[in-house]
């Protein structure tokens, strides 16, 4: 049996940044995943075990730190730009297509949470992808209206301050009260502050982003692109107990796509544990079977 390895890799983006992360080569020429994380999430958070799972089954996976986070380039730090992340997915495909373990005709966009929507946008614009798999796509960007207004006002003040040469303003993702300071509802806020600190520390996640990250999130309108995903094959995996992105809205998203497509309802699973644990492996298996049918390997 081949020894499974993990390679430290880096590649350049079209605008000149270097993104760094991990490659899990299958050891044989074949399919590959461009894996995309959720909002400000690190490569260490949740998906490394998923990459190993696919690697053991003959699928190469690429998992990198989002630009401006972790080991990847970009200033200011933790300045999240979802549109740029879509572009980075395209450059990841270009990088993977040159790797000896990857058949460039068998590269799949794979995303989780907000990364699932980013992956769908990438697939809508890049027909090099053989398929796209979206797990728990974030369809609901629910902000408290009062905090939303305050966040946008703060973002405008930050623009003036930055033009004057000052450093960027940062907001935490989860505050000491367990809430998102910008008013964005996040499933993680059900954890205690102590649990959240442990989560951020163990996953190498900075519990802050620039105020302009929230400005970009509030202006982001990805769903107009969704009809353009077709005819690329698409799979949506929806947790039945998702309290961050309503399952019925994920189903409505799925209904936009044309065949070939597949919808999987992950019973008794939530947004953050959809594909983890022993009972989560069955949904990874369904993804693998979908890939085998669509890519014919």
Swiss-Prot record:
It comes from Stachybotrys chlorohalonatus (strain IBT 40285). Residues 49-272 are annotated as: Abhydrolase domain. InterPro entries: AB_hydrolase_fold, Hydrolase_4, Polyketide_trans_af380. Pfam families: Hydrolase_4. The gene is ATR5. Polyketide transferase; part of the core atranone cluster (CAC) which products are predicted to catalyze most or all steps of atranone synthesis, starting from geranylgeranyl pyrophosphate (GGPP). The initial cyclization of GGPP to dolabellane is probably performed by the terpene cyclase ATR13. The Baeyer-Villiger oxidation near the end of the atranone synthesis, which converts atranones D and E to atranones F and G is predicted to be catalyzed by the monooxygenase ATR8. Of the CAC's other predicted gene products, the reducing PKS ATR6 might synthesize a polyketide chain. Belongs to the polyketide transferase af380 family. PANTHER family: DLTD N-TERMINAL DOMAIN PROTEIN (AFU_ORTHOLOGUE AFUA_8G00380)-RELATED, SUPERFAMILY HYDROLASE, PUTATIVE (AFU_ORTHOLOGUE AFUA_2G16580)-RELATED. Signal peptide: none annotated. One of its GO terms (molecular function) is transferase activity. It is an enzyme of class 2 (transferase). Its EC number is 2.3.-.-. Pathway: Mycotoxin biosynthesis. This is Polyketide transferase ATR5. Keywords: Transferase.
